Amino acid sequence: MQIDLPESVKEILNKFQKAGFEIYIVGGAVRDILMGRPTNDWDFTTNATPEEILKVVPGGLYNNEFGTVFTPNPDNPENPHEITTYRKEEGYLDYRHPDKITWGKSLEEDLARREATISAMALGPKYEIIDPYCGQEDLKSKIFRAVGNPNERYSEDALRMMRAIRISAQLGFTIEEKTLEAIKKNAALINKIAKERVKEEFFKLLVSPYPREGMLLLRNSNLLQEILPELEKCFGVEQKSPGRHHIYDVGEHLLISLKNCKSTDPLTRFATLIHDIGKPQTYKKLDSGTITFYNHEMVSTKIAENIAERLKFSNKEKEKLITLVRWHQFTVDERQTDSAIRRFIKNVGLENIPDMLSLRIGDRLGGGARETSWRLEEFKKRLLEVQKQPFSIKDLKIDGNDVMKVLSIKPGPK
C-alpha cells in the first residue's frame, strides 16, 4: 500500500536516522494508516534518551517522567508530536501509572507494554511494518485484542478498559472473548481512576460512530454498572401499554435515542442517554394496564445532577445537562401562545434550543415514532418567529428616550 506521510513526520524520521538513532512511528497513527484513515496524532519511539532527543530536535519540550519529548506539529498545533524513549514499566499501585520506568533496549520491548495488538505495531523510516502481535490480522478481522495477558493489562491501567470499549465503538470492532472476560473480571477497578478521566473517555464513546453498540459493550463488560448504575436499572423497565407509543423498555429506548441524536455535542448526547433515567423510580402500572411515569422528568433531573457531580462535570456542563433533562418533555401544540413559546425559550436558553430539538428527535425515534411531525415542524417555525420579538423591555430596539424624541416630549424633572 502507498503511505504518504506529512513533511514534518518525514523530517523527524530523517533527523534521527542521520543522527544514528532508531526511530519508529507507533500507536494509533500506524493503525489509522493501515485502515486508510486520516490522522493528525503522531507518536514516535526511539532508542535515544530524552536528552539525546532534544539534541536532534532542539525545539522540543521535556518536563515529564515518562521519557516523552513534545515537538511542534505544524498540521495540528494543539496536538504536538510525541517522541518517547523505548521504555519498560513496572508496578501499578494506583492502577493507572507505572511505579517504575526504565529505558528499554529494543523496539520489541517497548511494543510489549502496549495495551492492544492493533496499537502494538510500528512503522519504520523505510515504511516497513513491525507487527509482533499480529495486529494487522486483527485489523482485518475487526477485533480488539489485548497484548499478552489481558488481566495484567487492565490491572496495570484500569482506564484501558474504557479505551477498549471506546476504540471498539469508534472503529466498529468486536472485543475478543478473553479480553472481554478480563474487562468483566476487573470492571470494579475503574473506580480507582479519576472521574475526570472516566468522563473524558465516556464522552469520546458518546460521539463515536457506534455509540449504542459502545453502550452495549459497556453493559456487557460490567463497566456500566460501575460508572452509571442508574442507567443499568433502566433495562427491563417496560413502557409499552394501552395508549402508549413506546415499543422498547426504558434502557433500550435510551440507547436508541442516543443512536439517533443528531447533535455531535457529547453533553447533548449524554443528556439524550439519561433523559428518562428517573423512570424506574416513577414506574406505576394501573389496573387498566396503562403504565405511567408521572413527574419522571423531575426525578431524572435530580439524578442527572447527582451524576454530574459524581463524574466531575464543570458547572457549565452541569447546568446545560440539567436544563436539557428538565425540559425534554416540552409541549408541542399548535394552540400554544407566543407567551408560551417565549417561556420555553427562557427556560431552555436560546443557545440550547438546537440541542434540545436534537434530543427530541432522538427521543421520538427511540420510541418507535417518526423523526418529526407536522406539529414539531410548526413548533420550529414558531420558535423562529417568536425569537424576532422582544422578550422584555431591555430587548426592545427603542427605549423611552427614543419615544420622547419622536413625540417631542421634554424630559421631566430629575
Where are these regions (language model features)?
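Catalytic cores of the polymerase beta-like nucleotidyltransferase superfamily
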Residues: 1-414
